[in-house]
């Protein structure tokens, strides 16, 4: 599973720990019974501003180490944003703070779950 914008890290104990942080945020949505999503961790090849990427409706997400290092709240916003792309195929929406193209608003856990749930209900 590759992308041209993020270079995958090879799996190791350290990478597994990073990946676990991403998966823990996915588990915060387990009440919605989401499909299995493949998760890769890596580093941006070109733009340091890139925090994550998803294959639209293909249930694959890439999260950068930089996003993980920005803390739990930022990481949750990035993970939920990429999940909307990966699961539902929905593109950016500047009117929704979760789905803006740039991470301008950092949402609380409750607000992230609330916005994600709206997409889940819309597409299920």
Predicted segments with their positions:
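Metalloprotease/metallohydrolase-associated module, dominated by Zn2+-dependent proteases
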Residues: 4-73, 90-124
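Short alpha-helix carrying the canonical HExxH Zn2+-binding catalytic motif
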Residues: 71-87
């Amino acid at each position: 599973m590759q992308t041209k914008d993020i270079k995958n890290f090879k799996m190791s104990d350290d990478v597994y720990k990073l990946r676990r942080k991403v998966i823990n945020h996915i588990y915060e949505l387990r009440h919605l019974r989401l499909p299995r999503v493949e998760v890769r961790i890596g580093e941006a090849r070109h733009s340091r501003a890139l925090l994550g990427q998803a294959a639209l409706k293909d249930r694959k997400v890439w999260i950068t180490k930089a996003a993980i290092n920005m803390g739990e709240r930022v990481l949750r916003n990035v993970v939920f944003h990429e999940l909307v792309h990966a699961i539902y195929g929905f593109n950016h929406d500047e009117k929704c703070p979760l789905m803006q193209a740039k991470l301008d608003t950092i949402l609380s856990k409750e607000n992230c779950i609330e916005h994600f749930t709206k997409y889940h209900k819309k597409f299920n």
